[in-house]
Amino acid sequence: MAIGIQDQYFGTEIEMTGITRQRAAEKVAELFGTRAVCDGGYYGVWSVTDQEGKKWKFMYDGSIYTERRERGRMVPAGREYSTEMVSPKLSYGEMGKLQEVVRCLRHYGAKVNASCGQHVHVDASNHTPRSLKNAMTIMYSKEDILFKALKVQTSREQEYCQKVRPIVLEKIRRMPNSTIPWKVETGMVWGRDGSHDHYDDTRYYA
């Protein structure tokens, strides 16, 4: 059975500056009618829980060129202005909520510059082994068009948004359908599983 877009869960990470992580969390908490919590740690995390009990995080990212507004212009800023918003797992029906959060952040000063990017992670739990094969094949065949349409910078294509590796695609194409979920989950396709590490290399492929 084909998987429709309305059945697809996703999460996103949006990099921004112009607003501190604390202020971003506080303003989104106001939007949700909840409160912001300082989780701290190396990434200086602030978190907010929405009305459905899902946690949104605002954390430091070293790749962001930080700026703040001063007297109507943008000037260099400290690391507190490095803000990466990490959404929880969202359903298609929650797209409006994500849009509200983004509008809220923009209203209170969030902006992007050439150093900022966005990652979208697609949940594979509703996929079958065959649909995963098909999805990767389609993505591989349309990558050049997608990269051009999204205006992906050459620098990001070489580092943070690399194209699908043909060798990985070929491995998956050759696998029996029954083994794909286990081999993807355990990292056998990628060589290792570092997918839960914030800066692991396996995360930076389209």
How should each PLM-predicted stretch be described?
Residues 113-115:
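Active-site histidine-anchored catalytic micro-motif
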Residues 120:
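Conserved, mostly hydrophobic/aromatic
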